[in-house]
């Protein structure tokens, strides 16, 4: 008996590393020291920083992975993994520096795993961060053959005196909602139940334009790193930012607000994408659950002074992202919920 007969193919693992090497190295910023193969990835801090704060975040893709693996959308979930981490850390105004990934699988499928890493590298390049390292664990008997799980870890940096922590938010500020690319990577346990109930498959179309349902559900999470970089370089006075993930607007928008402030949102200020209408109709999902599970078309929020609405919306659209003034800040407290949305 040897390791391969026990289910772990070391040679396939080595071949996999060689296959992904060029994709990984293409993400490396000039601050990266060394290459693949060491025990730890190394990176210098960007030059010129005076009081740098490191901002870290970790996340996964959740059960979207099951749907993606059923339909071989491996590249997409690689992008999702980066987006779920990067979109969190940039809310502080931080610049993504590097990313690490962890993949665990029952049996190594070099083609599928390479597509995942190429997706991760794609997401890193879009975000301006280096894919500094990772781990691929082949765990036969623990995970089913042909299935894998993902986790990601991102580190970003911001000057301490440029940190965006929500403390500048005040009543009268405006809330700008930036469009999502779809469901993103939250709520897929519910999505999969709806698909099963509706007996939906690859041929299912939805909405007035009869779009392919599965393709739209598996569209990668929108990355907002280049948008935030553009907003900051435009010298816009950003008071707070929020990444709209699990819990939707009602649970994520209050997270960026200080004591004494509460958000008020008008649900009719943007058009809800038909994809969410299909999910609600096919699954009989109550309106409250819909709001507290999905982003409903708003993937990121920016809080700015009211006189900066037009500049902020224009800056978003310059990055090919739709944006709308969706609400305002009023007196109150974040824990009291968002006025205008289901509690």
Swiss-Prot record:
Q: What are the record's GO terms for cellular component?
A: cytosol
InterPro entries associated with the record = PurM-like_C_dom, PurM-like_C_sf, PurM-like_N, PurM-like_N_sf, PurM_cligase
* Keyword line: ATP-binding, Cytoplasm, Ligase, Nucleotide-binding, Purine biosynthesis
Domain of life of the source: Bacteria
**What does the record give as EC number?**
6.3.3.1
What metabolic or biological pathway is this protein involved in?
Purine metabolism; IMP biosynthesis via de novo pathway; 5-amino-1-(5-phospho-D-ribosyl)imidazole from N(2)-formyl-N(1)-(5-phospho-D-ribosyl)glycinamide: step 2/2
Mind telling me which Pfam families this protein's record contains?
AIRS, AIRS_C
Q: Which Gene3D superfamilies match?
A: PurM-like C-terminal domain, PurM-like, N-terminal domain
The GO terms this record gives for MF are:
ATP binding; phosphoribosylamine-glycine ligase activity; phosphoribosylformylglycinamidine cyclo-ligase activity
GO biological process terms held by the UniProt record: 'de novo' IMP biosynthetic process; adenine biosynthetic process
Where mainly found? Answer: cytoplasm
Checking HAMAP family in the record gives:
AIRS (MF_00741)
What family name appears in the similarity comment? Belongs to the AIR synthase family.
Record protein name field: Phosphoribosylformylglycinamidine cyclo-ligase
């Amino acid at each position: 008996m040897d390791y391969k007969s026990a289910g772990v193919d070391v040679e396939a693992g080595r071949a996999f590393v060689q296959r992904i090497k060029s994709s990984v190295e293409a993400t490396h910023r000039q601050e990266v020291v060394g290459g693949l193969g060491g025990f730890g990835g190394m990176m210098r801090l960007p030059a010129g920083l005076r009081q740098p704060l490191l901002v870290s975040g970790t996340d996964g893709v959740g059960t979207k992975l099951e749907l993606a693996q059923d339909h071989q959308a491996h590249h997409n979930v690689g992008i999702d993994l980066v987006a779920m981490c990067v979109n969190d850390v940039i809310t502080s105004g931080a610049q993504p520096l590097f990313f690490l990934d962890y993949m665990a699988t029952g049996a190594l499928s070099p083609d599928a795993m390479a597509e995942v890493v190429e997706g991760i590298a794609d997401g890193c390049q879009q975000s301006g961060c280096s894919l500094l390292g990772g781990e691929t664990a082949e765990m036969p008997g623990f995970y089913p053959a042909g299935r894998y799980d993902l986790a990601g870890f991102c580190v970003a940096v911001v000057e301490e005196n440029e940190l965006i922590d929500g403390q500048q938010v005040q009543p009268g500020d405006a809330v700008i909602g930036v469009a999502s690319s779809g469901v993103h990577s939250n709520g897929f346990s519910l999505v999969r139940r709806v698909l099963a109930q509706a007996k939906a498959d690859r041929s299912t179309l939805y909405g007035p334009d009869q779009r392919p349902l599965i393709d739209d559900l598996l569209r990668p999470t929108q990355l907002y790193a280049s948008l935030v970089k553009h907003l900051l370089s435009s010298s816009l006075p950003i008071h707070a930012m929020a990444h709209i993930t699990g819990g939707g607007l009602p649970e994520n928008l209050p997270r960026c607000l200080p004591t004494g402030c509460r958000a008020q949102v008008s649900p009719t200020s943007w058009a809800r994408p038909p994809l969410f209408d299909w999910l609600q109709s096919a699954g009989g999902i109550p309106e409250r659950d819909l709001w507290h599970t999905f982003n409903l078309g708003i993937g990121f929020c920016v809080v700015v002074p009211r006189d900066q609405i037009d500049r902020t919306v224009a800056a978003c659209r310059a990055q090919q992202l739709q944006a709308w003034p969706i609400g305002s800040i009023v007196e109150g407290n974040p824990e009291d919920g968002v006025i205008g949305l289901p509690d």
